Amino acid sequence: MAKKKYKLGGEPEELKLAPFMRLLKAVHSMQEPETMTTADLEKQRRSQEALGNMAAAMSGLVWEPFELGGMDAAWMRLERPHKRRRVILYCHGGGYTSGGLGFSKVLAAKLTRATGMDVLAFDYRLAPEHPYPAAIEDGQAAWDHLMQLGFGARDVVLAGDSAGGNLALVLCLKLRSEGRMLPGALLLMSPWTDMSCSGESLTG
């Protein structure tokens, strides 16, 4: 839907969404969650992956996929030489039911460009095929991988958007409950913090 932009002393003019935002809106508007079938969900997942692979600006960046304990993962790095003393562990969004490595490229690229830091993205298992705590277990596996590489907990920025923000928070709580060191920082973008969807911001 076109937005309206107003100028002082003038008539409103239509402000159209950028092509990428139109595609993103279309992908996430394929079907209402209440009526989404398994086929609809698979279609949305494939579309997200294709959109992410198409949209991520990779100039000056290197995308390095690898396997992490049976789970797909990838590094986003600057192409030029740089110090690797700190790292970002990025948890993608998607309502715990969609999203993946291809879709992760968009924000991983932005994070690397903005900070100069390497970003580790991982393809955690999705619901409904893999219910809780599968995603948390995969998040901890990614965290443990960074520790095995020699990063200290305080060297890690734990980042996530939407459901990925929830995953980042739950991972922190799990680390704390186990008496382990917590990350140096949290970077949460519109995190899903109300899993019951009963808060005033949703019901008021």
Q: Which residue stretches match the model-derived regions?
A:
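Alpha/beta-hydrolase superfamily serine-hydrolase fold, recognizing
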Residues: 31, 62-204
